[in-house]
Amino acid sequence: MRDFDKWLAAFRPSIADYKYYVDFDKVFANVEAIKIPLNILNSLIGTKNIEKEFEAILKQYPETLKCIPILLAKRELEIMAMDDEGQFNFKFNRMNYTVSDYTKFMRKTGLFDLMENHIVNNLVDYVTGVETGLDSNGRKNRGGHLIGERV
């Protein structure tokens, strides 16, 4: 028979160890995987002709397309969007709409405002913050594993 008083007395106010809060190895690896395309997109920060420059970047460096979802805190490479013109399912692993449609997407989501108004200075740093925030969901999993180890 189990002594529940002894078992309950062994509880601590927290199960968190130092690695519980953020898995920075994962964050840095995710950012590193797209660092070069992000730095290409950095050229849009503060530009006055962002739409034309974005279209030129997409044509010359189509691999930059895969960076756009994480700028919206999305890991999936497909994003649904609706407006007065209809429903769109944008793909970011390869273009399934025109460059002009992706330009409209950037404008309507606010990403162009973020860049052209210099709200952020560096997309690599910005995405590091986004990845850190998204990793909070991983904290739930880490918490479950830590509890499992203790029980």
Which ranges hold each PLM region?
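Catalytic core segments in nucleotide and nucleic-acid processing enzymes
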Residues: 149-151
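Nuclease-adjacent, charged terminal/linker segments that flank catalytic cores
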Residues: 1-139, 143-146
